[in-house]
Every structure is written in structure tokens, then in C-alpha cells.
Regions:
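Flavin (primarily FAD) cofactor-binding/catalytic cores of flavoenzymes
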Residues: 1-6, 27-283, 295-381
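Conserved N-terminal glycine-rich FAD pyrophosphate-binding loop of Rossmann-like flavoproteins
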Residues: 1-22
Length: 381
């Protein structure tokens, strides 16, 4: 997957907390707001174990194709343990595969003759590989931001970020700069639209991902770019053309785990018949309303408000446990402002839990100096 060594949460854990399983419950105490990946993984697995979910899941199965026939979904799939191809019928299908696993790789002039290394952020694993290297990072979203900071933190000689449309515009630390759009490569030299030239040893493409569902028939596939409200999904979940097909987590995201939970609770109630679908006209009107609101958004604060209101609406439609979405909204906005103040130190801040109200302690070591990302080092020092 796209999770690399030394990856720490780039948003406050208090914004992604599960309403029914707090960080305090899992760790037995409040922990700092920006944990590394091992800590978050442990938290997620703790919730899985509490619910005894593994015994209810069929693993080692690859879906080959999904078609809708005679009011049923016909799935062909491979049982990898026994190397058998099987076919079964199902009443509902929930697609919750995520959309950050199939890289989008653009072409640049001179790319094929570049003598250095070119990789997508999906394949980025260890920033220490690039110690004393001149690194070019292409992109202007969260992956570009974090990969660039990681390379700088672990000793890259230089880090140059090339953006296509809008610069991130942060106050980058020494050794980092942001320039406008890669025009071409000439040997080991990267030449940008604004005339900047930079020697390059490695180019990391933080250019996004594709929504990719090869296991679904064409007529069932969601086709969209990464956006806060994909079209054809009623309440961001139910496939407009077939209400027995549901998608979870297909949005661009500020909210994550608790939004996915609200979607899952809503999907459960649709499947169980507790939530009835309105008329086709009402569904179209509701989708159009949300898409129109999304298209007017101009800045992160507005985007946070938009997704918070969406998640609150879903929350109101099921019995998902109580959680303070207004505090989450405030936490997100404060986090964005911390990044503007200092992109290098925003992870050293503290936030309050929307589940327990507890205030996170400040981490014992500033992020920019914390080279050990193990759970033991994070929790026990």
C-alpha cells in the first residue's frame, strides 16, 4: 500500500477517532495528537479485535468480476487458499476498497531518458534512501507535502517541489523550495515553467490516484476524479443507478475513520431496509444540491465546513454513537492554521478528543527531531 516508513499522521488523531472506541480506551491513557503509522495501525486492529471481526470475514479471496443479473449480483472470485474459481450470488455489494492504490502517472518531456530514479509516491518507502540526494517532488497536495518534508528531515541535499496549478505556499524550511510546474527534463536537469533549473537525482511523482474498479462490470463502476462529493452517489454512498450497490470512502477527505463509520452505519440501514430510498427525482435533486455546493468551495475552511455538514447529516440518519463533530470541525481548522504558521512544527501541537474530551499531551520529542517512529519510542519515553 502507500504507507511508508517514518509516516506519521498528518492530521490530528482527534479528527479521525472512532466514536465507539476511543484512543484513551485503547491505550489506557491520552496520547499525543500525531502518532506514527504503527500506533494508528495498533489502534485500528484493537477495534477489530474488540468486535471479533476477523472470524466474520473471508480472507484470501480475489474478486474477478461482479455483474448484476436477475435482481442479484453475480460474483466470480478466486479462493486463493485452494486456488479455485467460484461463483456466488449476493443481494447487495459494498465497495470499500479505497481509492489511493492505483497511481496516476503523467508524462513529462525527457522522462524516458532521465538517468536518475523516477517513482510514484505509492512506491515511496524510506526517506533515508535519498540522503544527500537532490530530490524533485511533483505535486501540491498532502502526499507531496509529507514526502518532501520526510526527505528534508532525513537528510536530502535539496528538495524542490513542482506544482501544476496552485502552490501550497508554506514557509518551507532550509533546503526546500516550491516552483511552478515541471516543463521538461534534460539529462539530470529539471527545467520548470518559471525558468528554474535544478539538478535531480530522483523524481517522486505525488500526482494522485485513480478510482479503479476492474472487478466491477462497466455499468457498475464509479467514474470520478478525487473530489469531496463524487457524482452518482446518493448521500455519498448509494449508487444512483442501482440502490443495491454501495460505495464507502470514495470522497476526497478531511474526515476519515468516523466519516467512513457514518457511511457504513447508513449503508447497513439501507441494506436492512431501515432506510428507504426516495424517488429517482429526489435522489437526483439531492446529489445535484451537494455537487453544486462543492463546486463553490474556495478554501480549506469552506471544504472542512462542507464535509463536516455532510458527515453530520449522515450521522443524524443512523444510530452511530455520539461524537462531537463541532469539535472536530474546530480541530481541523486549527490544524490548517498551524500548518500555515509553520509547516515543520504543526505536528507538535495538541488537540482535544471529540469522544472523551481528554486533551492530548505534547509529544516528548518534536516531530522534526523524532527519528524513531516505533510505537515503543512514541509511547514509552
Amino acid at each position: 500500500n502507500s504507507m511508508y516508513r517514518y509516516l506519521w499522521s498528518n492530521g490530528p488523531k482527534e479528527c479521525l477517532e472512532f466514536a465507539d472506541y476511543s484512543f484513551d480506551e485503547h491505550f489506557g491513557k491520552p496520547i499525543p495528537s500525531f502518532p506514527p503509522r504503527e500506533v494508528l495501525h495498533d489502534y485500528i486492529i484493537g477495534r477489530v479485535n474488540k468486535g471479533n471481526l476477523k472470524n466474520k470475514i473471508k480472507f484470501n479471496t480475489r474478486v474477478i468480476n461482479t455483474a448484476f443479473r436477475n435482481n442479484k449480483f453475480e460474483l466470480s472470485y478466486q479462493d486463493k487458499a485452494n486456488n479455485k474459481i467460484l461463483v456466488d450470488s449476493f443481494d447487495f455489494v459494498v465497495v470499500s476498497t479505497g481509492h489511493f492504490s492505483v497511481p496516476f502517472i503523467p508524462e513529462y518531456k525527457g522522462m524516458n531518458s532521465f538517468p536518475g530514479r523516477i517513482m510514484h509516491s505509492h512506491d515511496f518507502r524510506d526517506a533515508e534512501e535519498f540522503r544527500n540526494k537532490n530530490v524533485i517532488v511533483l505535486g501540491s497536495s498532502y502526499s507531496a507535502e509529507d514526502v518532501a518534508l520526510q526527505c528534508n528531515k532525513y537528510g536530502a541535499k535539496s528538495v524542490t517541489i513542482g506544482y501544476r496549478n496552485n502552490a501550497m505556499g508554506f514557509k518551507w524550511p532550509k533546503g526546500m523550495k516550491e516552483v511552478h510546474y515541471l516543463d521538461r527534463l534534460e539529462g539530470k536537469k529539471a527545467i520548470f515553467k518559471d525558468g528554474t533549473e535544478q539538478d535531480a537525482d530522483v523524481i517522486i511523482l505525488c500526482t494522485g490516484y485513480l478510482h479503479h474498479f476492474p472487478f466491477l462490470n462497466e455499468d457498475l463502476q464509479l467514474k470520478t476524479h478525487n473530489r469531496l462529493y463524487p457524482p452518482k452517489l446518493y448521500k455519498g454512498v448509494v449508487w444512483q443507478n442501482n440502490h443495491k450497490l454501495l460505495y464507502l470512502g470514495m470522497q476526497d477527505q478531511f474526515h476519515t475513520f468516523n466519516m467512513f463509520d457514518c457511511q457504513a452505519w447508513y449503508a447497513r440501514d439501507v441494506i436492512m431496509g431501515k432506510i428507504k430510498m426516495p424517488s429517482d427525482d429526489e435522489i437526483e435533486k439531492d446529489i445535484s444540491k451537494w455537487v453544486a455546493m462543492e463546486e463553490k468551495l474556495e478554501n480549506p475552511d469552506q471544504m472542512i465546513d462542507f464535509q463536516t455538514e455532510y458527515t453530520k447529516e449522515l450521522h443524524s440518519m443512523s444510530d452511530y454513537p455520539k461524537i462531537d463533530f463541532e469539535l472536530i470541525r474546530e480541530n481541523f481548522k486549527e490544524w490548517e492554521h498551524h500548518k500555515v504558521e509553520d509547516i515543520l512544527t504543526y505536528r507538535n501541537k495538541s488537540f482535544s478528543s471529540p469522544v472523551t474530551g481528554s486533551v492530548a499531551p505534547i509529544h516528548h520529542t518534536p516531530w522534526e527531531k523524532a527519528m524513531d517512529d516505533s510505537m515503543k519510542a512514541f509511547l514509552n519515553k
